[in-house]
A protein has these predicted regions:
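Juxtamembrane/disordered regions of integral membrane proteins
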Residues: 1-113, 117-135
Length: 135
């Protein structure tokens, strides 16, 4: 499993940077308008770090590893996108079901973002894995 480590680490860095740009520059007003009353003044970075470590581990296991030996990147992207959709949908649909006034629009945007980000991260992981494991 160590052969996946460079891809895992590169994907964590890539996802963190892209998600940081998304959250701080693009989606922040959406979150502020929709759930600003729930947002902490300062994010709890330790929990964010744990999320990225765990999420990318799941992405590697369910999307990259099964497609590692397949030359086509399409199956890796689709598997990653589906993984992201299922994870983000679990979060967003649970919030819609349980939290008062959780905005549907925010959930749709968040699930779309999670799907696209995860598919792209799976591609990054596959590319790094392929480059670092040439035979």
């Amino acid at each position: 499993m160590l052969k996946y480590l460079p891809a895992y680490l590169a994907t964590i860095i890539f996802m963190f940077i892209v998600d940081l740009i998304w959250l701080s520059q693009i989606a922040q007003p959406l979150y502020q308008d929709g759930i600003g009353h729930l947002m902490a003044a300062t994010p709890k970075l330790a929990f964010a770090a744990i999320f990225y470590l765990v999420f990318v581990l799941g992405l590697m296991w369910f999307a990259v590893r099964p497609n590692a030996q397949i030359k086509s990147v399409k199956s890796t992207f689709v598997a990653g996108a589906l993984f992201g959709f299922f994870v983000y949908a679990s979060y967003d649909l649970t919030n819609l079901a349980l939290l008062k006034d959780w905005p549907l629009k925010l959930s749709i945007i968040d699930m779309t973002w999670g799907t696209l980000l995860s598919g792209t991260c799976a591609l990054v992981a596959k590319l790094v894995f392929t480059k670092t494991n040439k035979t």
